[in-house]
Amino acid sequence: MGTNPVHGLPFLPGSSFTDSTKTAFHRSQTLNYRNGYAVVRRPTMGIGGDRLHYNQLSQAELDELANKAPILTYGPLKQAPLAEFVPAHVAFDKKVLKFSAYFQEDVPISMEEHYRIRHVNIYYYLEDDSMSVIEPVVENSGIPQGKLIKRQRFTKNDMGDHYHWKDLNRGINLTVYGKTFRIVDCDRFTQDFLESQGIELNPSEKIPLDPYTQLRKEPVRKYVTPSDFDQLKQFLTFDKQVLRFYAIWDDTDSLFGECRHYIIHYYLMDDTVEIREVHERNNGRDPFPLLMNRQRMPKVLVENAKNFPKCVLEISDQEVLEWYTAKDFIVGKPLTILGRTFFIYDCDPFTRQFYKDKFGMPDLPPVDVTKKEPPPVKQELPPYNGYGLIEDSAQNCFALIPKAPRKDVVKMLMNDNKVLRYLAALESPIPEDKDRRFVFSYFLATDMISIFEPPVRNSGIIGGKFLGRTKVVKSFSPVDNPIYYSPSDFFIGAVIEVFGHRFVILDTDEYVLKYMESNASQYSPEALASIQNRIQKPELPAPELESKQATGEPMVQGTEESKVQDLDALIDQIHMHLKYNSYKENLRETFQMYDKDESGYVDRETFFKICETLNVPVDDSLIKELIRLCTHGEGRINYYNFVRAFSN
């Protein structure tokens, strides 16, 4: 509530009074809506409800009202009703401005193009001022195309402003996300809309051509000299003349492949080729006659056409350097047509006569292409695992249910209960094994060997069966073709290797001698002499031999029997002389290596070479005498007797 001074009284305390009728002291409202539009009116009432005089009509307005204006006579003009308010998202719904543009893309690594021109369409959506960039899809372009920039509001500058349709026009550059688009044209609706808004459009431009696309559209220049060949003459001369060839297509190298027969027709009138398949009865194939229709066959293609599959390539004259002709079809030579290789093995009589007259080929012999039976497959046995006999193990590879190997029944009946027994010593560097003796039993019926060691009291070695009855393979025999020990390998001084153990035959019984005499053809003369002399020899006293060597008296070569006796006595003397000396154990194997014929002899040069390699004291007097006794004939030395002197 306020106080107002009374007119004519000074504004002093006591001269102002409060108007109790005034109850509203708010400011008058001047903002309002009329027909959907915001309007402003002048305030007419002040605070407290007092009328404002300074917001009334001006003097000019009062003068105008005072005039006799038509409005005083006819009244105020009626204003047209305002249009109904329509929001922008409704007014511009589905209204899009379309601009045609392009941008230039650099191609850094290419010898054929340095840049390419890509066409795009820029769409401006009036309802929310958003934009999008879409590139029309070009078939087989090899470039990811379609929507380049999704619909959004494009940033105009760093201040955060966005592009508006007032900023778009023809002939301007539009930079979005670092990529510059050149707007060259727009559609009819866009042109009408911009002109209706008072925007003057620039003239339209043309999109520049892409250099690589234009290069590909240009035809390949091919400078061909017109041929003087008369095709009409060829047609009239060779009409109804066809060369017939018989060929095969061998596809047996591939999975489920087979060899199929074909007939190749070459038409001389136009140099075309036709391939027909020869069907057999009940071959399981559809009896379609043609494999390849009649057409010209390319022989040499241009470089670019070689990388394309031949089976789907539509051949044209620009892609072919050379075509197949009649001289390319020769009997006995392969021919590749559309990636498939045919072998021509025969032709008809007319074709032979044509090649004889045209190319001077008098003889075109047919080639035999009948399928030959493959050679039988040799069954290969797996490697021997060392268990049991090889013959027994091999039966597992011959049948699902193994059978016992066949036996020589005649041999078993003739040699039943015939056993050859030998006394042998074990060659071993262990001193306790030097005095061990073994009895070898060779069973002639089955060629098996058993070894028995007689027990010796207080020897510390359990005697008895050393090896059960079995076949023994020689150490140097191959695994796939084993060689077993036979009776001819057993004689005095022979070394028998049984599963890594080396035995030296020392003695035998009278039955072995009788068997060797009755089967002398199986043994060498040295083997027969060694066993016979071993049984019948008298001992030569060693002191007498020593006296002969000491005095240097020559030993006269007597009979063969006395020579063997002297040799045995000399070997015993060398054993005592070389008792504390040791030599290599492979002395016998070295001699056998150089004895290719297994005769038991080597020449003198080889003999002394081996002795020098193994450090054998050949300069010793006893060794010299041993070499003399072991010499037979001219320059041949029996190394079996020589090695006996060095065995323990």
From Swiss-Prot:
MF terms in GO: alpha-tubulin binding; calcium ion binding
All residue ranges annotated as the EF-hand domain in the record: 582-617
InterPro entries the record matches: DM10_dom (IPR006602), EF-hand-dom_pair (IPR011992), EF_hand_dom (IPR002048), EFHC1/EFHC2/EFHB (IPR040193)
Major subcellular location class: cytoplasm
Keywords: Cell projection, Cilium, Cytoplasm, Cytoskeleton, Flagellum, Repeat
Gene Ontology terms: cellular component: axonemal A tubule inner sheath; axonemal microtubule; axoneme; centrosome; cilium; mitotic spindle; neuronal cell body; sperm flagellum
Stretches for region Required for its localization in the mitotic spindle and interaction with alpha-tubulin: 1-45
Tissue specificity comment: Expressed in adult brain including hippocampus, cerebellum, cerebral cortex, thalamus, hypothalamus, amygdala and upper brainstem. Expressed in soma and dentrites of pyramidal neurons of the hippocampal CA1 region, pyramidal neurons of the cerebral cortex and Purkinje cells of cerebellum. Highly expressed in testis, trachea, and oviduct, moderately in lung, and slightly in brain. Highly expressed in sperm flagella and tracheal cilia (at protein level).
Domain DM10, first and last residues per copy: 93-198, 239-359, 416-520
Top-rank taxon, per record: Eukaryota
Pfam families linked to this entry: DM10_dom, EF-hand_7
Signal peptide (UniProt feature, chain positions): none
Record localization: Cytoplasm, Cytoskeleton, Cilium axoneme; Cytoplasm, Cytoskeleton, Flagellum axoneme; Cytoplasm, Cytoskeleton, Microtubule organizing center, Centrosome; Cytoplasm, Cytoskeleton, Spindle
GO BP terms: flagellated sperm motility; intracellular calcium ion homeostasis; mitotic cytokinesis; mitotic spindle organization; positive regulation of apoptotic process; regulation of cell division
Function field: Microtubule inner protein (MIP) part of the dynein-decorated doublet microtubules (DMTs) in cilia axoneme, which is required for motile cilia beating. Microtubule-associated protein which regulates cell division and neuronal migration during cortical development. Necessary for radial and tangential cell migration during brain development, possibly acting as a regulator of cell morphology and process formation during migration. May enhance calcium influx through CACNA1E and stimulate programmed cell death. Overexpression of EFHC1 in hippocampal primary culture neurons induced apoptosis.
Assembly, per entry: Microtubule inner protein component of sperm flagellar doublet microtubules. Interacts with the C-terminus of CACNA1E. Interacts with alpha-tubulin.
Stored PANTHER family: EF-HAND DOMAIN C-TERMINAL CONTAINING PROTEIN, EF-HAND DOMAIN-CONTAINING PROTEIN 1
Name of the protein in question: EF-hand domain-containing protein 1
Annotated source species: Mus musculus (Mouse)
